[in-house]
Amino acid sequence: MKFKDLRDFVQQLEQRGELKRIQMPISPVLEMTEICDRTLRAKGPALLFEKPVGFDIPVLGNLFGTPERVAMGMGAEAVSELREIGKLLAFLKEPEPPKGLKDAWSKLPIFRKVIAMAPKVVKDAPCQEIVIEGDDVDLGMLPVQTCWPGDVAPLITWGLTVTKGPNKERQNLGIYRQQVIGRNKIIMRWLSHRGGALDFRDWCAKHPGEPYPVAVALGADPATILGAVTPVPDSLSEYAFAGLLRGSRTELIKCRGSNLQVPASAEIVLEGVIHPGEMADEGPYGDHTGYYNEVDSFPVLTVERITHRIKPIYHSTYTGRPPDEPAILGVALNEVFVPILQKQFPEIVDFYLPPEGCSYRMAVVTIKKQYPGHAKRVMLGVWSFLRQFMYTKFVIVTDDDINARDWNDVIWAITTRMDPKRDTVMIDNTPIDYLDFASPVSGLGSKMGLDVTNKWPGETTREWGRAIVKDEATTRRVDEIWTQLGID
């Protein structure tokens, strides 16, 4: 099923029993987090808080609180269908030359479909039904959550940030958290390697001292939101990818104060500029690690204009120790990653990012091992192939008789197939998540690879153990008489 905007998605979720309207007054300060956290852990519905205390705008929370709703948002009926999206992205990332005329014709519809999904610019849009400018701008109108007791201020969490580099034809979409520090000021927390930060850096180099235009869309359609967090190849824009997911071109409208283009159906849009050199201390905030992050300095966005739909919906979330909504997104997007990795490394059978590992800090990979040292090649490939795994601290590589998603299996393999000295790969001075306070230096730390495969000649001189396998005939016999035994 495809959804034209956030409201259409909300309506369809409600019809399926996947959304609950909360009519009791609930505070955005701590209370919404507590309710959403309990609901997510119970695999419950999305929540629409219709009467946030002190505000007239309803708050939508826990929208992607189950992998199934993430799949729905990407236009799939089941989480398993996300593998097909991954296969499409893998093909678009590295398309293979046609093997012949027939093969070329078979691939043509894919490229036609991609070309046909170029975004469409419109002149009028719901996101500009109401326009607030100048001194009338007040971010205090938005029911921005304060998620945890130690949070320093309200935090915008689902802002889809739109930027454009001076030397680029295409816009960048990114989701960065934004601390509210005044009626028209927010802190743009983007890390130095992220697209928005790179665009801003290039702007400052080419236009020193000039204000940099930025837009933040809140409450875009689900395909556009999820397109911004998916590993889309550089040859494909997030807006075009969202069109592929949705089955229709993404409609955009030019901002009223800049040439940036934002989703026409967004609920709320913040337009503004970053003045080079204007920085502010951001944090502390409770984060997806389960800890409060340290304070650091980031650019300040001055909001010059707020546009929104009539009776807008504010889309929000919280981040904390997994499981949280980003962790659930990680579980679903894991299925997209698998075919992309398999395209580059066909020996990979499965790839798993455990949500309790903050969704990216640990990976378990199962392979069809083909030669000594194979596991080490794969772990190095995982670290280098996709930028999404730049911060993965631990990579465990096992044979394909192990279930990567079963810790009982993985721990058994670690303790029986691995020698700590021989089978551990340590790499120092590598990029590490800025939020990882365990690293000796902010943004720089080490990585560990664990070769948990059965060892081949050349890797060991010892006779390798043979795994115990049950006798099939005996198993069938006991299956037949089991109920008669009366044990259960």
From Swiss-Prot:
GO terms assigned for molecular function: 3-octaprenyl-4-hydroxybenzoate carboxy-lyase activity; metal ion binding
InterPro entries: UbiD, UbiD-like_C, UbiD-like_N, UbiD_bacteria, UbiD_Rift_dom
Subcellular location, principal: membrane
Cofactors demanded by this protein: prenylated FMN; Mn(2+)
EC number: 4.1.1.98
SUPFAM superfamilies membership: FMN-binding split barrel, UbiD C-terminal domain-like
Keyword Secreted: no
Membrane-protein topology: Peripheral membrane protein
Highest taxon above the source species: Bacteria
Annotated catalytic residues: 287 (proton donor)
Positions that bind Mn(2+): 172, 238
Enzyme class per UniProt: lyase
GO biological process: ubiquinone biosynthetic process
Pathway: Cofactor biosynthesis; ubiquinone biosynthesis
Cofactor binding notes: Binds 1 prenylated FMN per subunit.
GO CC terms in record: cytosol; plasma membrane
Reactions this protein catalyses: a 4-hydroxy-3-(all-trans-polyprenyl)benzoate + H(+) = a 2-(all-trans-polyprenyl)phenol + CO2
Residues where prenylated FMN binds: 175-177, 189-191, 194-195
Protein keywords: Cell membrane, Decarboxylase, Flavoprotein, FMN, Lyase, Manganese, Membrane, Metal-binding, Ubiquinone biosynthesis
Family according to the record: Belongs to the UbiD family.
Purpose: Catalyzes the decarboxylation of 3-octaprenyl-4-hydroxy benzoate to 2-octaprenylphenol, an intermediate step in ubiquinone biosynthesis.
Stored PANTHER family: 3-OCTAPRENYL-4-HYDROXYBENZOATE CARBOXY-LYASE-RELATED, FERULIC ACID DECARBOXYLASE 1
Official protein name in the record: 3-octaprenyl-4-hydroxybenzoate carboxy-lyase
Species of provenance: Pseudomonas savastanoi pv. phaseolicola (strain 1448A / Race 6) (Pseudomonas syringae pv. phaseolicola (strain 1448A / Race 6))
